[in-house]
Design a protein with these regions (language model features):
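Transmembrane alpha-helical segments of polytopic membrane transport and secretion proteins
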Residues: 1-33, 125, 300-337
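Membrane-water interface segments at the C-terminal ends of transmembrane alpha-helices
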Residues: 26-63, 78, 82-205, 234-254, ...
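Juxtamembrane inter-helical linkers in multi-pass membrane proteins
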Residues: 58-70, 222, 306-322, 358-385
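Glycine-rich helix-loop "coupling/hinge" segments at transmembrane-helix boundaries
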Residues: 62-66, 154, 251-275, 314, ...
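Amphipathic alpha-helical segments in well-structured domains
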Residues: 70, 74-77, 133, 162-166, ...
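Transmembrane helix boundary and interhelical loop/hinge segments in multi-pass membrane proteins
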Residues: 73, 201-214, 223, 235, ...
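Glycine/proline-centered hinge or cleavage motifs at structural transition points of membrane proteins
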Residues: 219-220, 233
Length: 438
């Protein structure tokens, strides 16, 4: 009896010592705390949304279909997938959402990846300016580029709205597929996320070991083979991370499809949420399933990726591709023009719109009459002049100032919280790479 009791006591002491040792390291405490918090904040909303898909909501379509005011039913699933409106409420928005996400990934990775390659691996001119200005679209909200697209290409004849710059100045009316729908939405989102691809892929290009490429050059390996067999596999993690984040963000994007007239799962969710609450929750579940699937594929791909190791030290110089005497200037000029329209022109366009007496009234550009411009949207200090349809101008409007203060407060708080949590989790994970918690 004494021996068995002694063994149990010794085992308890060992367990307690292990627990004490585990919690003596701050990274373990951080992992445990954030593991619990993140699990709860991730699982709880999913459970709530799944429950909402079966729940009967008073005054909505599921209550009408079941004849009940409360309880649970599968009527939402049956109606969404099999009713006459299934094509309008589910299949068309789903197809548009997937196509939008795919095209956004292609545009952002091709544009951002090519830009990263030119900046980091060639003798291109104006690199500092281009690398700085290229980030602007990612800093600006999504809807800014969408509104600029409207301001430039919309026309009363095609979209039924006020004329944009092209229609007002040159009487050019772009086709409807150019102004509204999948094409402009994919282009705008692709341009918005291209800087993100540039940051990730460019970081890999800057820090990658050039020894393998140098070895391929010494062995007289063709350039295309070096690119596809060495360079691309080394930037594969950055490309996959870009696909994951861009695809998920594009799937859930609401402002751009809303402004550019594309029906997606996110826009359909907003329109259905009042009368088709349960069915709208099913749309949210579908979007989450896509996100989880992309995440799993990314994890599987990263686990199976090849590791490249050299027996020497890291090369001190990354080989640069010579674009030629003319090419390095010509490509730089082309990129400067492109970045002007994606980064600087949106700011100028918004500034110009604030001085127009009416939306789409660009008459001062061909009359050169500055009196056609107005500052009423900024400086009107009373409600009678109709500066903001019965409200004072921006600088005298208390609602605008309260909104500005609220926006800044939310932005600062989110930055501090996200930065702190991200730093703590990054520290803990880097210290426990082999841990299951990490």
């Amino acid at each position: 009896m004494n021996q068995s009791a002694t063994k149990k006591t010794s085992k308890m002491v060992i367990v307690l010592n292990k627990i004490k040792t585990y919690f003596s390291k701050p990274q373990n405490i951080i992992l445990l705390l954030f593991g619990i918090v993140l699990t709860f904040t991730t699982v709880a909303p999913i459970v709530a949304i799944v429950e909402d898909t079966f729940k009967i909501h008073p005054g909505t379509m599921d209550a009408h279909l079941t004849g009940k005011a409360s309880g649970y039913s599968v009527a939402n699933y049956v109606d969404l997938f099999t009713s006459k409106l299934a094509r309008t409420n589910l299949w068309t928005p789903l197809l548009n959402t997937v196509l939008l996400a795919v095209f956004t990934c292609l545009i952002s990775i091709l544009f951002g990846g090519l830009f990263a390659f030119l900046i980091t691996r060639t003798n291109l001119k104006c690199k500092k300016y281009l690398s700085s200005i290229f980030i602007f679209p990612y800093i600006m909200p999504q809807w800014t580029l969408a509104v600029v697209w409207q301001n430039v290409f919309n026309s009363n004849a095609v979209t039924g709205t006020s004329n944009g710059l092209l229609a007002s100045l040159f009487n050019i009316t772009m086709p409807k597929w150019w102004c509204l729908g999948l094409f402009p939405s994919a282009v705008v989102l692709g341009l918005h996320y291209a800087p993100f691809a540039y940051i990730l892929i460019g970081g890999i290009f800057r820090n990658m070991d050039a020894n393998l490429e140098e070895a391929a050059t010494i062995l007289d390996t063709p350039k295309w083979k070096t690119m596809f067999r060495i360079t691309l596999p080394m930037v594969k993690p950055a490309i996959l991370s870009t696909i994951l984040l861009v695809f998920g963000s594009a799937m859930g994007s609401y402002p751009v499809p809303h402004y550019l007239g594309l029906t997606t799962l996110s826009t359909k969710y907003i329109s259905m949420n009042s009368k088709y609450t349960g069915e709208a929750s099913i749309l949210a579940i579908i979007m989450m399933i896509f996100g989880v699937a992309i995440l799993l594929m990314n994890q599987m791909s990263l686990k199976s990726r090849k590791n490249y190791t050299t027996v020497t030290g890291k090369s001190g110089q990354i080989s640069k591709i010579n674009l030629g005497k003319v090419g390095k200037y010509l490509i730089a000029v082309i990129l400067i023009v492109i970045t002007f329209f994606t980064s600087i022109f949106p700011i100028l366009s918004f500034a110009l719109e604030t001085f127009l007496p009416n939306p789409g009234d660009y008459s001062f550009l061909y009359t050169m009459d500055s009196s056609a411009l107005t500052t009423k949207w900024w400086l009107t200090d009373n409600n009678g002049a109709g500066a903001l349809y019965g409200q004072p101008g921006i600088l005298h409007n208390p609602l605008i100032w309260r909104a500005f203060k609220g926006t800044m407060l939310v932005a600062v708080c989110c930055a501090l919280i996200a930065g702190t949590i991200g730093t703590l989790i990054g520290y803990a994970v880097s210290k426990n790479r082999r841990s299951k918690w990490a």
